Every structure is written in structure tokens, then in C-alpha cells.
From Swiss-Prot:
EC number: 2.3.1.37
Family of this protein: Belongs to the class-II pyridoxal-phosphate-dependent aminotransferase family.
Cofactor(s) demanded: pyridoxal 5'-phosphate
Underlying gene: hemA
Metabolic or biological pathway, per its Swiss-Prot or TrEMBL entry: Porphyrin-containing compound metabolism; protoporphyrin-IX biosynthesis; 5-aminolevulinate from glycine: step 1/1
Catalytic-site annotation from UniProt: K248
Molecular functions (GO terms): 5-aminolevulinate synthase activity; pyridoxal phosphate binding
Organism encoding this protein: Rhizobium radiobacter
Oligomeric form and interacting partners: Homodimer.
Annotated Gene3D superfamilies: Aspartate Aminotransferase, domain 1 (3.90.1150.10), Type I PLP-dependent aspartate aminotransferase-like (Major domain) (3.40.640.10)
Protein name as it appears in the record: 5-aminolevulinate synthase
Length: 405
């Protein structure tokens, strides 16, 4: 087989469909978020405003977080020095797990190298180790959850997205004696809709199922202390496992689960994705602790963030720019064409100094291509007006459909 020819042909198909991914070469400017420096292929540099960061609250630039990380490097050095089991458990890891358990009102927590790994390792381990387990997975769950369930090789039942009737029908049809787990997200990353957590917990109680809630797009963002949608709705105690990330609203890196002492110890003891990898650097753990502690105490970032989301949506509506209506902070501006979506993104970056990454298939279904915009507390009124003005101009240029008020 001509491997190079195969690779080239497969890549060419992405180019021809307008969905080949190109990384924007940018450098975040410390203390100047959401500004960044863009490096062109010819070596030229240009300032841009980032509108697609998952550093939702700008905590990656927060002075408390940065100082905590610097202090940890000065105190501990760069890396953890090993796996958690072999010399890699630094005291910062222990403190971080205590902080996370407290955030979600759980007995225990366990940190991983990323949110992807925490989902993959936890769901895969549960699927492998619990005899006869059936995992009921929402149809729009993240790839890390899908891959984890697949890795677990247990029975998997897909239920229609956020459809309680379909979930109950599938629970009712399953073996009543089989162990069950319902896996779902709180805020879904591409459409920005929110799961009916209470009603799912009611079904879990009725059919004797565990619950696994991915809160990666909600932790830090919702609830009086940033514990997510489950905290906001007073439901944390009803969930078996709450999973989250340190790399979005908390502005650092890593993933975690929280739950009972027994379930966290079970994953710690059996999950290969936890056991056989180097622990997070102590500096990242220190930064995460500072970020979590700040957001537990400060409502300012969350309130300001919601204000920015409302401002952006209002201006988009005024210009007839179609965006998906949802109750979260994620603002998907709908284009519906892969080539046009990429073209708009390119022109925004090259001509307007606005960086928004196009979202195309397979991340979203074909004909639902979009610009996934994520306002932050640090975007000004002028930033928002500049973004919407540029979109208005490009919408007319592409003859794209306008939203009707």
C-alpha cells in the first residue's frame, strides 16, 4: 500500500469539502485578554481579538492564578516527577482534590490530565468493571464520553438528545435487574442547550440507575460558587458522579471527577488512564486551586459574563444575524455552509482582526456549520459592536439568510 498517497487523498477530501482544519497561530497577551498576537505564515504579526476561547471568564489571565503558578514553580520546580502512584502526588494535587470535592458537595475528587481523559477513563473503567452494566448515553454526548463507553465494551443504549420520554422508554425496556448508568452533559458545547437534570435524576431513581454528569461547560460559570448547573438547581447530591474540567472557566488545564469516596477510589485503583500517566505539574494544580477559590467567592465574573452574552445577542438580533437561541453562554451563529463558514472566519481574521474558529462537520452535522462565539467578561461594548458590524457586512457579501425578528 502507498501510505503517503492514502494520507494525501484523505486530506484532499477534507480540503474539497471545505472542512480542512487550519490552526490559527496566536500568542495570548498576558494581562490583555481577549487580545492576542497572530503570527502569519510569512512571519508578520498582528493583534486580534479572540472570540472563541474556552477560557470563558479570563481566569487564565487572572493575577491570582498566575502568581500561584509562579510560586509553585519556584517552590516545586516544573514537573510532577512521576505518576500519582510513583512519586508524582504533590501536595498541591491533594489540596486541589479537596477543593473540588467541596465545590461539588461530594466526599472525594480525582484529578486527571484533561477533561477528555477523565471522561474516557472513568466511563471506560465503569463499563469494563461493573458486570452487566448498561450505559444510557445522550445522543449528543461529547466524543470523550462516546469513546470511553466504547472502550468499556459494555452494553450501550443511545437515547434521543434531552428526550425524557425516549430515555424512560429505553430504561423501561432494559433488564430490570441489570445495573444501569445514565451519562449526559449539563451544557452541550455546540448548541448551548441545557439538560433537564432534575427529571433525569427522577428517572434514575425510578429505575435504579447511577448518574454521570459532564459539567465541563458549566463549572465556574453557574451556581452561587461556580459549581455548575447542578449547583444552581440544587441537584448535586442527586448525582452519582460529577465530571468537570480545569481548562475552561477555571483557565488552567486538567480534568476531574467528584463523587463518593468509594467511587473515586475505585476509579483511582482501576482506571488505566489515571494510573499509567504522569501527574499534572504542581504549578497547574496551584493555579487551579487559586482559580476555584476565587470563583467560589466572587460573583462578579459570572454576572459580567452574562451581561456580555445578553449584549451580544441583542446586537445580533438587531442586525438580523441568525444565532441559536439557548439559555447558556454559548452563542452559535448559524452559517449552514462549510465553505462559507470558513471563508467568513478567514475574512474576520485577516481583515477585521476578529478570531472566531469555524465549526464544521463532523463536529456538527452538515448544513449546520456555524461560528461558535464565546463572549467573556473582558469583551467591551466596542469589541461587541465591532464583531457584529463585521458579521453584518460579511452576511450581506455572502447573501446569507437573515433572522426575522
Amino acid at each position: 500500500m502507498d501510505f503517503e498517497a492514502f494520507f494525501t487523498t484523505e486530506l484532499q477530501s477534507l480540503h474539497s469539502e471545505g472542512r480542512y482544519r487550519v490552526f490559527a497561530d496566536i500568542e495570548r497577551q498576558q494581562g490583555n485578554f481577549p487580545r492576542a498576537t497572530r503570527y502569519n505564515a510569512n512571519g508578520q504579526r498582528k493583534d486580534v481579538t479572540v472570540w472563541c476561547s474556552n477560557d470563558y471568564l479570563g481566569m487564565g489571565q487572572n493575577p491570582k492564578v498566575i502568581e500561584a503558578m509562579k510560586a509553585a514553580i519556584d517552590h516545586c520546580g516544573a514537573g510532577a516527577g512521576g505518576t500519582r502512584n510513583i512519586s508524582g502526588t504533590n501536595h498541591y494535587h491533594v489540596l486541589l482534590e479537596q477543593e473540588l470535592a467541596d465545590l461539588h458537595g461530594k466526599e472525594s475528587a480525582l484529578i486527571f490530565t484533561s477533561g477528555y481523559v477523565s471522561n474516557w477513563a472513568t466511563l471506560g473503567t465503569l463499563g469494563q468493571k461493573i458486570p452487566g452494566l448498561i450505559i444510557f448515553s445522550d445522543a449528543l454526548n461529547h466524543a470523550s464520553m462516546i469513546e470511553g463507553i466504547r472502550y468499556g465494551r459494555c452494553e450501550r443504549v443511545i437515547w434521543k438528545h434531552n428526550d425524557l420520554e425516549d430515555l424512560e422508554a429505553k430504561l423501561k425496556a432494559a433488564d430490570p435487574n441489570a445495573p444501569k448508568l445514565i451519562a449526559f452533559e449539563s451544557v452541550y458545547s455546540m448548541d448551548g442547550d441545557i439538560a433537564p437534570i432534575k427529571e433525569i435524576c427522577d428517572l434514575a431513581d425510578r429505575y435504579g440507575a447511577m448518574t454521570y454528569l459532564d459539567e465541563v461547560h458549566a463549572v465556574g460559570m453557574y451556581g452561587p460558587r461556580g459549581g455548575g448547573i447542578a449547583e444552581r438547581e440544587g441537584l448535586m447530591d442527586r448525582l452519582t458522579i460529577i465530571e468537570g474540567t480545569l481548562g475552561k472557566a477555571f483557565g488552567v488545564m486538567g480534568g476531574y471527577i467528584t463523587g463518593s469516596t468509594a467511587v473515586c477510589d475505585f476509579i483511582r485503583s482501576f482506571a488505566s488512564g489515571f494510573i499509567f500517566t504522569t501527574a499534572l505539574p504542581p504549578s497547574l494544580a496551584a493555579g487551579a486551586i487559586a482559580s476555584i477559590q476565587h470563583l467560589k467567592a466572587s460573583p462578579f465574573e459570572r454576572a459580567r459574563h452574562q451581561d456580555r452574552v445578553r449584549k451580544l445577542r441583542g446586537l445580533l438580533d438587531a442586525r438580523g444575524i441568525p444565532h441559536m437561541d439557548n439559555p447558556s453562554h454559548i452563542v452559535p451563529v448559524m452559517v449552514g455552509d462549510a465553505a462559507k463558514c470558513k471563508w467568513i472566519s478567514d475574512i474576520l481574521l485577516d481583515s477585521h482582526g476578529v478570531y472566531v474558529q469555524p465549526i464544521n462537520y463532523p463536529t456538527v452535522p452538515r448544513k449546520t456549520e456555524r461560528l461558535r462565539i464565546t463572549p467573556t467578561p473582558l469583551h467591551s461594548d466596542a469589541d461587541i459592536e465591532h464583531l457584529v458590524g463585521a458579521l453584518h457586512q460579511l452576511w450581506s457579501h455572502c447573501a446569507l439568510a437573515r433572522a426575522v425578528a
